[in-house]
Every structure is written in structure tokens, then in C-alpha cells.
From Swiss-Prot, chain B:
This is Cytochrome c oxidase subunit 3. GO terms for biological process: mitochondrial electron transport, cytochrome c to oxygen. Belongs to the cytochrome c oxidase subunit 3 family. Its main location: mitochondrion. It comes from Cyprinus carpio (Common carp).
Amino acid sequence: MRLSLLILRQSRAKKEVTFSSVLVLVRLPEHSGLGEIITMFRHLRNLQQVSRRTLSSTARRQLENKVPVKQKMFQEDNGMPVHLKGGTTDALLYRATMALTVFGCGYVLYALIDAALPKKKA
Amino acid sequence: MAHQAHAYHMVDPSPWPLTGAIAALLMTSGLAIWFHFHSTTLMTLGLILLLLTMYQWWRDIIREGTFQGHHTPPVQKGLRYGMILFITSEVFFFLGFFWAFYHSSLAPTPELGGCWPPTGITPLDPFEVPLLNTAVLLASGVTVTWAHHSIMEGERKQAIQSLALTILLGLYFTALQAMEYYEAPFTIADGVYGSTFFVATGFHGLHVIIGSTFLAVCLLRQIQYHFTSEHHFGFEAAAWYWHFVDVVWLFLYVSIYWWGS
């Protein structure tokens, strides 16, 4: 297996989360010559540019400040308590937690009473 | 929507104190059932319930503070008192284990060979991994302070970087300590030396994990724009806790690792 270390440099554009240089460990096919290496390098550069465009646009979307939206949602005068005010997911999670709580209560009572009663050995 | 004529926070009715109490019941009873009947079901159920309770309770606190604006200055003052008192209680928790260590090590019994470390115990070299661990935690104290100043100065990117670095250092400490535990030439069953060593350092390690988790939550919140340069108490609480963890390690290092060898 032939391995080659390529150091790729990119220009740091404004408002993009990019690295100034990227270290890439590449596995080369056996018997690859200089021509193949250059082609592979070109492919990698293209891939980088595409991923950079994709990453930066999604990154910008992900890092948007959603606090004002949340503030509006949680300050809505709908009478809901804070633990259910987020929507359906809140209700599902609450029901699951309460179900486990009730079941757990019953199970612990059973387990402790069973542990407390002497068992006759057959 | 605000109908109150005061600055204090009258919380909405919440189910989490109940679910948390039941979780504690299930965990403790589950521990007893595990010891006597080899079944971990009850204890596992308790742990799941505990995790669910913690997630939802603290999620609600974030909603009340960041999204509903309930954390006014007097409320924040109360939260500060609360965190300080909690950390103080943790200090007393560790004081007990240090008391146990000094009780046994200052006057070693004839059963130990009348010496400390006891006969047959090869202690860890304090100038190897333990010293590295000390450097790691001290460095993390610097990075968390850097994060705090970055938040106060509105330097978003630096705050994220320094907070991430703090967490990485915490994880590095945990990994190193786990490796030390695996490689140690003595175990928890090796008399009072083993007991005091692993219980004290073990509880400390647990607190490092808790502190790292707290900081990780703060990192997520910082990324999501929850903190402002004036109001970021969640982060401050995490930073106080982290400094406490650091100081406990320093005492552990000097007492158990260094003097105790």
C-alpha cells in the first residue's frame, strides 16, 4: 500500500468556516505514476471546492441565531406550563418519563416486598 | 403576559422533582437488589429516569431564563448563592475522604507494616502521568478563564474555541486517568491504601466527567447564541465548578500522590 501525504492550501474567504491548510492522507493505487497522481490531486481539489461551498452554506444556516424565535414561542400566552410549551416532543417525552416513573414505583414495591418475604427452599 | 409586580420567579408546576425522587428510590433500591439478587434491571431503570429528569429539568431552566426572561438580577443572585452552596457541600464531601486518608496515613498501623505507603504497595510515580494530569487541569483553568473573557468581550469565535479546548483538556485528563487506573500495580482491594486512593481519585474523576459535561452544554449554548456579554450565568456556574474540580485535584496530588508516596 502506498501512502502519500498531500498538503492542500486554500484561501481563507470571509464568513466561511474553512481551514487555511488541510492535511490529507491518500492511499495511492499500486504502480501509479506522476500523471495519475496529478489527476488525483485535481479531483481532490474539485471535491474540496464543492464541499467547501456546501459546508459553508449549510454552516451559515446552522449558525443562525434562533433565540428571538424561541423567545416568541415560549412567551406566547397559551397557558401551557414550561415543560410542555415546546410542542409535541415535550408531551411525548413527558409521557414516557411519567410512564417509567409509575411503572418503576410499582416494580420497586414488588421487588422490595418480594425480597422481604422469606422463601421456603424446596 | 407578565402579571407580577415583583422581580422574583414563581415557577410553573413541574413533574421533574417527583420523577427525580422516584429515580433516586429506584437507583438505591436497585443497588440493593443488584447486590443481593444479581439483577440490574431496577437500577438501570432508575438511571434512565434520572437522565430523563436531568435533561428535562435543566432544559426547562434554560427556557425560563433565556427564552422567558425570568432570570432577573435578584433571581440570578439566588442562583449564584445556590451554586456556591452546592459547591461548598461538595467540598465537605471531599473533606471526608481526605480525613480518611490522613487518619490512616499519619499513623499507619502494625498491620500495614507501620509505614506509609504500606509494605508491599508500589505507589505511582508522582512526577510521571500524575504531574502531566496536574498540568492538563491547570491549563484547562486558563482556557476556561480565556473563554469567560471572550464571552464578556463579545468574541464569539474565541469563546467557542477556548471552551472547546477546555473540554478537550478535561477529556484528555479523563483518558490519562483511566489509563493510570488500568496500569496501576495496586487495586481498590489492597487495604486502606487502595481504598483511600481509588475512592478519593475515583470521585474526583467522576466530578471531572460531570464538569466536562456541564462545559459541553455551555459550548452548545454558546454556539446557539444563548449567552450575552452581560448575562451568562450558566457558563459562570460551569467555570466555578471546573475550578473547584481543579483545586480538589491539586489537594489530591499533593496529599495522596506526592506526600503519600
